[in-house]
Every structure is written in structure tokens, then in C-alpha cells.
Amino acid sequence: MIRPIAVAIAVLALTACGGGGSNSSSSSSLPQGTTPVKLDPADFTTNIDNPYWPMRPGSHWVYREVENGEALEDTYDWYAQDSHGNLWYLGEDTAEYENGKLKTKEGSWTYGVDGAEPGVVVPASPKQGMTYREEYYAGHAEDAADVLKVGSQVQVPLGRYRGALLTRNYSTIEPTVEEMKLYAKGVGPVMELLVSGGSGRTELLSFSR
């Protein structure tokens, strides 16, 4: 399910076992569709330096999406970077609220549990036209993304950024829903816009390292 950018992020060391991961960021080597992947911890690094989302343990980004003045969702996401610079998405713990009360945790998933597969949120060297899976948990989380532009401009409450990465994000579960996301160099995701299947806007309020 397509969801707002996380309100808090935990950087994890990969502990799964298996074969090698992607060794480049061409679309053909990135995770696609429902195809399983096996990630080898030896292919990963604790130095998270992808230029469009650098992070280290303790990094904290704060976002807000509101409707009628109320927060809709809190999410914790887990990421790891391979030695080539691809930033992998390994799971999320999400909670949606309605009238201030927990409504559902639908969409939560963890790589390797109940058939859930990881995806990539930011390729090592994104290029226009790239496409890749972001997450796959059958019937619950089936997001993918296309790179639309490298070099966009964006302004959010925290500031104005040039050279941003612009992606189109969509899900086979919600085929009428489409979002655009922008990632600023040296910062990470700064804006998310729902452009089809509704309306909504998520912006970066603050972040710390």
C-alpha cells in the first residue's frame, strides 16, 4: 500500500543470509515485481552514504501529513545500503489513526517473514527511466517506482533544494493511486505529493543527525 514517508527512521545492519544482492543500479539489476531476492550481509555496509539519502544510526527525519488537522500515520522504516550504494527497504512498522485512535497496522511487513520481499528506495546512481520494486508483501505492500528526473527543484518548510531526485510511485494494490516523491541531496526525502486517486501532501519539517 502506498503510504506517507516515514516519520522516524532506524538504520539497521543486515542480518539475513543468502546469495548476493544487486551489483549496480541499472533497472535490470534492481528488484522487480514479485521476483524473490536473497541478500548477503557481506554485500552491505554500515556507511550509508547514498547522496540522495545519507544516514547514520541516530539520524531522525520528521514528516507530517494531516487531514482535517489530525495526524494520519506514524511509521518506522528499516533500511540498509549495499556496497554499491543502493539503499534497500527491509520492512516497516506502521500505524494509522482515526480520530486520534489506532485504526490499523495494515501494511506493516518485514523481509523474510510470510514471504515479504525487500526492495530499493534509492538506487546508487539513479537515472531517468529506471524502474524498480520498493517493497513486496503480497496483498499488503506492493509498491514500485520510476525515476522521472534527476535535477529537480523543491521547496519545503525546512528550505529550498536544487538537484533533487524526482520519482513516480505506485502500487498494484491501488492502481488508481499515484504519488511523486522528491529526494534532496545530502538530506533525503523532502516531499511527497499524491497526484492521482486523491490529494495529499507530505513535507519534511526537520531532521537531525
Can you say where each PLM-predicted feature lies in the sequence?
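Bacterial N-terminal signal peptides that target proteins for export
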Residues: 1-6
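C-terminal motif of bacterial Sec signal peptides marking the signal peptidase cleavage site
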Residues: 13-16
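Conserved functional acidic sites
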Residues: 18-209
